[in-house]
């Protein structure tokens, strides 16, 4: 029994220590990235990402998309964004949507872009909310719908995306007072449901 307990305690300390090491490695990678020491950041992010760390996967996606410390490679960016997006990282979902919208690393597919923007927007990502507004306003991947465009621009603006407010005001000029009221109602309901004022 004593051996079993010692083994379990050792195992517990190993997991606690390794979790701490992974957290330290991630923070070291973030710090290196902020210093623009991309080669070090990449070396630290890669093993974490390969072990399934969604934040590290997202970070590698950014590095490949922007060519930071690695040659710019949109296919590789999509791979890492997708892995993080599938784990629920809102920024990964938004950036994966952006890749589909632009056709970078994947064939252009507006419907797929809308899918990922929506998942991210529902989590409160202001850029995704704005991007979803653009898709509705332009009728890309969805039927053109100024009410929905206004709704998502309004929500994005309330979450700090200045372009959301600007585009809301532009699209408003194409809408009737009843449509504007409906869009405002939908935005208000979404914000109340998601704990926003």
For the regions a protein language model found, what residue spans apply to each?
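Bacterial N-terminal signal peptides that target proteins for export
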Residues: 1-9
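Short helix-capping/linker turns of helical repeat alpha-solenoids
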Residues: 32-37, 45, 50-53, 66-68, ...
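Terminal, low-structured helical/coil segments at or just beyond the last alpha-helical repeat
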Residues: 28, 161-197
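Cleavable N-terminal signal peptides
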Residues: 10-11, 21
């Amino acid at each position: 029994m004593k051996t079993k307990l010692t083994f379990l305690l050792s195992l517990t300390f190993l997991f606690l220590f390794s979790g701490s090491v992974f957290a330290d490695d991630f923070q070291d990678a973030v710090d290196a990235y902020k210093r623009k020491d991309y080669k070090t950041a990449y070396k630290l992010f890669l093993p974490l990402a390969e072990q399934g760390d969604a934040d590290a996967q997202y970070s590698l996606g950014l590095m490949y998309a922007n060519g930071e410390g690695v040659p710019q490679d949109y296919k590789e960016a999509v791979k890492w964004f997708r892995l993080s997006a599938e784990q629920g990282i809102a920024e990964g979902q938004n950036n994966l949507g952006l890749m589909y919208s632009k056709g970078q690393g994947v064939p252009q597919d507006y419907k797929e872009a809308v899918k990922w923007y929506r998942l991210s927007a529902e989590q409160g990502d202001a850029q995704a909310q704005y991007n979803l507004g653009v898709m509705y306003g332009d009728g890309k991947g969805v039927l053109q719908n100024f009410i929905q465009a206004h709704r998502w621009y309004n929500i994005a603006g309330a979450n700090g995306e200045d372009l959301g407010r600007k585009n809301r005001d532009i699209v408003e000029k194409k809408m009737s007072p009843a449509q504007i009221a409906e869009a405002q109602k939908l935005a208000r309901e979404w914000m109340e449901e998601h704990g926003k004022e």
